[in-house]
Amino acid sequence: MQSAAAVGLLRPCGATTAAAPLQLRNPSPRGFGVGVGQPLLPPRGLRLSAVAPRAGISARRIGLVPASPEQEDERRRGARDVAVAATAAAAGEAGAEEGGGLAKTLQLGALFGLWYLFNIYFNIYNKQVLKVFPYPINITNVQFAVGTVIALFMWITGILKRPKISGAQLAAILPLAMVHTMGNLFTNMSLGKVAVSFTHTIKAMEPFFSVLLSALFLGEMPTPFVVLSLVPIVGGVALASLTEASFNWAGFWSAMASNVTFQSRNVLSKKLMVKKEESLDNITLFSIITVMSFFLLAPVTLLTEGVKVTPTVLQSAGLNLKQIYTRSLIAAFCFHAYQQVSYMILARVSPVTHSVGNCVKRVVVIVTSVLFFRTPVSPINSLGTGVALAGVFLYSQLKRLKPKPKTA
């Protein structure tokens, strides 16, 4: 093996000779040489490289060399195209969002329209049947029966997910079903005795009973503004009652009892706090309550009025069998449909918006029934109804204002 000194990595000790200075010789046919050694580079002919143009273009791109007018125009057109494309993309996204928002608005408007339409048809057909067939327990049970069939159909077909509830949950739902049954029964009893418009005017007092029962059983004390909003409600209902042409005490107290039972249902639902599974949303809970209400009211029907919806009973009373059955079934379908649509709306909007929509719905039902049945209405009666409904609207707005927490 050669030593490091042999290969020139180390100078031999004591060597004092200095290296000859490097100098570049004149080019020779053999190439460029350094010092006295062999030529460093072999001779090659000169040729153009393709790298040079790219280097020039790169230099122009970074501004080292000015670009030609054609290249500058091309660059501007490219930048303009990119800007146009970005603007179009942003506009497309905004348009998609706007289109999605418009679709949701139209869908919500359609649901409100169906809610009002089903309510109108229910009240009109229900009133027509109750006027000639004064058996409100039978009619109410028919409505629960139709609702039960609809609920079972939706569960069997998979439109609604089958509920998975325990015995404890059924026991908690039972009181809700009981007051739900009584509330609808009292409403039908009132509709059979007085005008539709008057029943719904009395039912405008629901906020009064809601505040009263919540304070008594839940300890929820209302704000002074909420209490003040109840004054026009009570005053308007009183004024409308004094001037109501169809007034009778049975219809009046039935509507009042309906208010108490429906608001008791709301208080019970808060107090019992029914634990919901994933498959137990509001629509499913309403369907379960409807089925339970049918089985609760069926024996009561047998023990009180008896089964009066048979063809024999209807024909003996001189009633048109086809008309009674058709209108009863339409009213029952609309009864179940408008409550389902109401829950669908509640899932999309805030409770305050829903309560305002409910107030408007009551106005629509009152006006429609007055026009359809040609109910005589005096100016004082109209004023009382209007004041009561205005109070309901004011209540719904003030209810959302939460009292500020007291600081120490």
From Swiss-Prot:
Gene Ontology MF terms: phosphoenolpyruvate:phosphate antiporter activity; triose-phosphate:phosphate antiporter activity
Transmembrane segments: 105-125, 139-159, 165-185, 222-242, 245-262, 283-303, 375-395
NCBIfam families per UniProt: tpt
Species, as recorded: Oryza sativa subsp. japonica
Underlying gene: PPT1
Keyword Hydrolase set for record: no
Cellular component, GO, one term: chloroplast membrane
The protein's name: Phosphoenolpyruvate/phosphate translocator 1, chloroplastic
GO biological-process terms attached to the record: phosphoenolpyruvate transport; triose phosphate transmembrane transport
